Regions:
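Acidic, divalent-metal-binding catalytic cores of TOPRIM
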Residues: 1-180
């Protein structure tokens, strides 16, 4: 990307995957050297930004074909799905650390793993696979309310004030041509 002779702002938006914070910082540093505006989501993937109980409830209430859905029922189900997926986060972070630290001793690797896991699970809604979350939630909504659900279904039901700051800020910067 350093061959950008046209002086056109180049933007790349990426999921963090299960990369460590150190790896992500290094990628951002490399991107700046190459004149690439790189933004790595703070959440696991873009779908995680659509995990909003109010927007999910609005969509579900409007489109359900059977049953009665309420905020307490939906909130409980969302927490169940998140809890189900937390184990995947632990496994995938550990796998990534092992793959990238073959020469690091086991004690250091375990400490790094625990630090990354604590950081990610500070808010499990952010760390889980958003795609898998909506897949599991959709299985439940189809069975109980005869409606599929996905991030794309939910996003139009966000109120302006519900749009996550990170998303709104990034869109604003790109639209105005600012560097990230």
């Amino acid at each position: 990307f350093s061959c950008n002779n046209m002086k056109v702002a180049l933007y790349c938006i990426s999921n963090p995957g299960y990369h460590t914070r150190g790896e992500i910082k290094e990628r951002i540093r490399e991107a700046k050297v190459g004149s690439l505006n790189l933004h790595v989501w703070q959440k696991h993937e873009i779908d995680n930004y659509a995990i909003n109980v109010d927007a999910i409830l609005k969509y579900s209430t409007q489109h359900k074909r059977k049953g009665k859905i309420s905020l307490p029922i939906l909130t409980k189900k969302i927490e169940e799905v998140v809890n189900t997926l937390e184990g995947d986060v632990l496994e995938n972070i550990s796998r990534e650390l092992i793959a990238n630290s073959a020469n690091v001793n086991a004690i250091h690797n375990m400490a790094l793993s625990n630090e990354e896991i604590d950081h990610r699970l500070n808010n499990p809604h952010d760390a889980i696979s958003g795609k898998k979350f909506f897949e599991l939630l959709s299985n439940w909504t189809q069975e109980n309310y005869e409606i599929p659900i996905s991030a794309l279904h939910v996003i139009p039901y966000f109120e302006r004030h519900e749009v996550p700051n990170e998303v709104a800020s990034l869109i604003s910067k790109i639209m105005s041509g600012e560097n990230l």
